[in-house]
Amino acid sequence: MDVKKVVLAYSGGLDTSIILKWLIESYGCEVVAFSADLGQAEELDGLEAKALATGAVKARIVDLREEFVRDFVFPAFRANAIYEGQYLLGTSIARPLIAKAQIRIAEEEDADAVSHGATGKGNDQVRFELTYIALNPAIKIIAPWREWDLKSRSDLVEFARRHGIPIPVTKEKPYSSDRNMLHISYEGGILEDPWLEPDPAMFTLSVAPEEAPDAPEFVEIDFERGNPVAVNGERLSPAQLLTRLNALGGRHGIGRVDLVESRFVGMKSRGVYETPGGTIMRTAHHAVESVTMDRELMFLRDSLVPQYSRLIYNGFWYSPEMRLLQNTMDLAQENVYGTAKLKLYKGNCVVIGRRSDRSLYQPSFATFEEDDVYRQDDATGFIRLHGLRLQIESLVRGKSR
């Protein structure tokens, strides 16, 4: 494959630093190192200088934090997306944005190829490449882990030494991690034993629930059309709001999940996740929905959530079926305005109140006291009609005995 210039999704770790040098050596091409700022904090320090020192002709770090939360996290949370009942899709939802920005930079830099550092066994290779194909079918794709003959950690270290690529002198973590504004994930290494409890020192965004404050903290979150817009009455931008909720949740040990998930490529893998702000946001969203969404609308929407979540997990963010589902999910949120009040305490996020000017909860109908709006004897015919098919089935079954 003839390649003149490649835009590499560059994290600054040993793997993508080696890939940068390998691309130059294997393809004789120029490499532009692209890094997406999704809230990795200090992980971005020194990234540009490191990329240039490794051989990149240019290094670009793009702040995508607001776009990430506004256009990717919020749509997923409007839909109550969750994979296999536990995973809030923190890594999955970030990949299409990184790949989208990578394609944009490739077009700006007149590059004819893109490259990523995802392995041939994981989900990320699919997520990156499906986005590349959807947004620029003509772009060439280089996936080094599926091409090169570097098969082990020792092979990578030897390649780095041979090419003068700095190898971290700090003790290697016995697991891998991936961080953005929504979550941090941990997998591999010692976590591959699903019976082994994670090291408490591993966690970054949250304190252990048993070490959280002994007094609860209360928070109110306002929603408009299913989007959180304010915390305790203060309106915030999407990224600011998620940052605030991360701090609150982390302080109280909220949002830790240890699970085994089904990868798109076929195998199961263990993942440990911290999603403090997202957990609060999801709980509050459910609370406001409970008083503002029609029952049948909610049932229908809920039936679509598993498929919607699988599309995100499997990398089909830019597919026609995702556009259809997103439009449907957003239509279901037209009436979701209101405020949820939560109590945060030692790993627990508990709804203690909800209110809305558009509330479908009407005390005059729901009261257990005497009322003038609901005729209890109407229930007799209601029950008879709904029981008719059961009555017929029982009669037929009795005849067949």
From Swiss-Prot:
A GO molecular-function annotation: argininosuccinate synthase activity
Residues that, per the record, bind ATP: 9-17, 36, 117
Binding annotation for L-citrulline: 87, 92, 123, 127, 176, 185, 261, 273
GO annotation, cellular component aspect: cytoplasm
Compartment(s) of residence: Cytoplasm
Class of enzymatic activity (EC top level): ligase
UniProt keywords, alphabetically: Amino-acid biosynthesis, Arginine biosynthesis, ATP-binding, Cytoplasm, Ligase, Nucleotide-binding
Catalytic reaction(s) noted: L-citrulline + L-aspartate + ATP = 2-(N(omega)-L-arginino)succinate + AMP + diphosphate + H(+)
Alphabetized Gene3D superfamilies for the sequence: Argininosuccinate synthetase, chain A, domain 2, HUPs, Single helix bin
Listed CDD domains: ASS
EC number: 6.3.4.5
Primary residence: cytoplasm
Statement: the UniProt record of this protein carries the keyword Ligase: yes
Binding annotation for L-aspartate: 119, 123-124
Example GO BP: urea cycle
NCBIfam families: argG, PRK00509.1
Record family assignment: Belongs to the argininosuccinate synthase family. Type 1 subfamily.
UniProt cross-references to PANTHER family, sorted A to Z: ARGININOSUCCINATE SYNTHASE
Subunit record text: Homotetramer.
Protein name (Swiss-Prot/TrEMBL): Argininosuccinate synthase
Organism: Syntrophobacter fumaroxidans (strain DSM 10017 / MPOB)
Gene name as annotated: argG
